[in-house]
């Protein structure tokens, strides 16, 4: 049944003006100016929860998603930790590694489960290499230590099927 809702998939919004005109572009329709009473922007991205990414161990204070850490540091002015480990080499993770360093934290490393970085090469250079932050590929967190507060994590190398390799565990405090 029709809901009367217009859906524009694969469309990038360029501007929403105060008079409710939506300037957008898509491969299929090109440039358009749409008008609407209400607009719902669905960007196609969301943070995955700890459960969705299968992080082991307990959830003590001191573990943040990239988005939460970004909000605390950039918007609220809080440093979320003095010693930082980042899991995931996406652009936000690398940008946060640099930002945390600039704010005075010691970023131990960025760990990526894949055998290749997932962010842009310029972010590897500008956010990690320029600040001496190591990037470890084919590694993941295999244990979290601490009850009330995070004390340490264990990282392990992974095989080509992304399974931890026994004997490669390293505790990072």
Provide a role label for each language-model segment.
Residues 7-18, 22-24, 101-173:
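A Rossmann-like FAD-binding core segment of flavoenzymes
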Residues 1-83, 160-171:
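FAD-binding core/adjacent interface of flavoenzyme oxidoreductases
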Residues 37, 66-70, 97-98, 125, ...:
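Predominant activation on well-ordered alpha-helical scaffold segments within soluble catalytic domains
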Residues 50-52, 95-97, 146-147:
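Short glycine-/acidic-enriched loop or helix-start segments at secondary-structure transitions
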Residues 68-116:
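Rossmann-like NAD(P)H-binding beta-loop-alpha module
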Residues 40, 46, 77, 87, ...:
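Residue-level signal for well-ordered alpha-helical segments
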């Amino acid at each position: 049944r029709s809901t009367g809702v217009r859906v524009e998939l694969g469309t990038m919004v360029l501007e929403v003006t105060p008079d409710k005109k939506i300037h957008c572009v898509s491969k299929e329709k090109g440039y358009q100016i749409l008008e609407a009473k209400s607009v719902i922007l669905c960007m196609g991205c969301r943070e995955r929860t700890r459960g969705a990414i299968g992080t082991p161990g307990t959830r003590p204070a001191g573990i943040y998603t990239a988005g939460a850490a970004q909000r605390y540091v950039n918007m609220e002015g809080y440093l979320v930790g003095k010693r930082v480990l980042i899991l995931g080499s996406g652009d936000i993770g690398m940008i946060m590694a640099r930002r945390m360093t600039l704010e005075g934290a010691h970023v131990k490393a960025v760990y990526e489960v894949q055998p290749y970085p997932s962010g842009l090469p310029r972010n590897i250079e500008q956010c990690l290499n320029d600040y001496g932050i190591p990037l470890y590929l084919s590694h993941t967190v295999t244990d979290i230590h601490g009850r009330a507060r995070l004390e340490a994590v264990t990282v392990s190398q992974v095989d080509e099927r992304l399974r931890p390799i026994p004997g490669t565990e390293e505790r990072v405090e």
